[in-house]
Amino acid sequence: MKHLHRFFSSDASGGIILIIAAILAMMMANSGATSGWYHDFLETPVQLRVGSLEINKNMLLWINDALMAVFFLLVGLEVKRELMQGSLASLRQAAFPVIAAIGGMIVPALLYLAFNYADPITREGWAIPAATDIAFALGVLALLGSRVPLALKIFLMALAIIDDLGAIIIIALFYTNDLSMASLGVAAVAIAVLAVLNLCGVRRTGVYILVGVVLWTAVLKSGVHATLAGVIVGFFIPLKEKHGRSPAKRLEHVLHPWVAYLILPLFAFANAGVSLQGVTLDGLTSILPLGIIAGLLIGKPLGISLFCWLALRLKLAHLPEGTTYQQIMAVGILCGIGFTMSIFIASLAFGSVDPELINWAKLGILVGSISSAVIGYSWLRVRLRPSV
């Protein structure tokens, strides 16, 4: 029990469970004995009915639309906390990770488009390598233990949170189709109710969650991706402490283990099961997976390093205390771990077009993410001196 408690207390535990879930999915999807069961599980229909309102989706879509909304609720809470009290609370603190994140989104997207611009279908996946899997990246960094300067951990977390915020904006602007104005109207009313609750100082988290369920349903029916409802709810839950208690921090504390040890691993299990049948070197080096691999493995560190260098040269920001530029470059490589966020965007980009494209995209994401994890970890291990 002591070893189990030590494992779950480690920052690396969430990343390790993610890896196990992804490997298990790959094994089951490629085994004759279990592939049928794996796909049957994902296609299991689940129906929710309240009066005349009916939501009928398969298990995969419930995981991607409902459970991931809880993940984005946690992201919303984290972003709000960092903006108001944490590493993004002042312009001086926020400048370096914000500039790094912008470079880490622009350059991978441009590199992907360099491979895929001529194809109007695969071009839609330009945002896939712009994402970073915060849990996976922090998990890999945690494997290095106490050698990692606290400032470097905070930099990676701030960068990844801004990256997540960028991904949310991208999803809202570029991966939303066929809008239902009636449902958007209901969503607008729900958001207004959340704002009133916040302004009136209501601190009962359950009330916000209840309105959040209405908002999630309306957003789902509107054509906008339902996970955005989670972020909106997270922004409205009060952060300010009263009698030593903060509703937002308390909910963040409650949600974190559920997201790290259940929701993200379940998402990885449901989405990482790519069949390798028929996969060839020619296929893996075709424009879609190659663009993703190049974006994650080259574009991410290049964009982050280049924009950080420009920020330092132009005196727009300064290095976090106790870190070196070489360490920042290594963190840039770790940000190439797109994994769950990249898979999520790939499912939005190609889900209604061609399932085969999603498979090739997932292969590119897995190769790019694993390569980034191994290279980033190795580089940091060399660059960080053991603590005495």
Curated annotation (Swiss-Prot):
Function: Na(+)/H(+) antiporter that extrudes sodium in exchange for external protons.
GO BP, sorted A to Z: regulation of pH
Location in or out of the cell: Cell inner membrane
One family name in Pfam for this protein: Na_H_antiport_1
Species name: Shigella sonnei (strain Ss046)
Key words of the record: Antiport, Cell inner membrane, Cell membrane, Ion transport, Membrane, Sodium, Sodium transport, Transmembrane, Transmembrane helix, Transport
Annotated TM spans: 12-31, 59-80, 97-116, 123-130, 155-176, 181-200, 205-222, 224-236, 254-272, 287-310, 340-350, 358-380
Domain of life of the source: Bacteria
GO molecular function: sodium:proton antiporter activity
Name of protein: Na(+)/H(+) antiporter NhaA
Topology term for the membrane: Multi-pass membrane protein
Stretches of the chain found on the membrane's Cytoplasmic side: 1-11, 81-96, 131-154, 201-204, 237-253, 311-339, 381-388
